[in-house]
C-alpha cells in the first residue's frame, strides 16, 4: 500500500452470472441469469493521481437469496468503528438495475454477459481512506460479510 496514491475502500454487491444474456429482452429479467450475489470489498487506488483502479477485491461467500437485494443495507467498519453505510436502493432503485444496465450495454456492444462472469454494483457508500494496518469489515444485510487487512 505504501506506493499507492490515496488508497480507499468501497462496498459493492457482486453478481455471478449463471446463464448467457443473449438479448435485450433477457437482460431485463435479472432473476433469469443471476446465479448468486455476494458482498465485495474493493480497494481502489493508483500509483499516481492520474491513474486509479481496483488494487484488490475481497469476495464474501455467495448467496442465492436474490430477494434481499432491493433492501440490502451495508455498513463498513474500519478498525472496529462504523465509518460508512449505505443501502442498495440508493443506487438508482435496486442493485439489480445496475446489472440490467451492464447486460444491455454488453449486448449493444455484441459482447454478451456469459456464464461465470462477475458484475459489481456501484459502491454502496462513499469511499473511505485506507492506511497500512487498517482492518476493514463490511456487512451487507442478507448477503453476509467480508474482511480485509491493509498491509504495507
Regions found by a protein language model. Name each.
Residues 125-128, 142-145:
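Short, charged beta-turn/beta-strand-edge "cap" motif at the junction between a beta-strand
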Residues 127-137:
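Short glycine/threonine-rich loop-to-helix capping motif typified by GTGT followed
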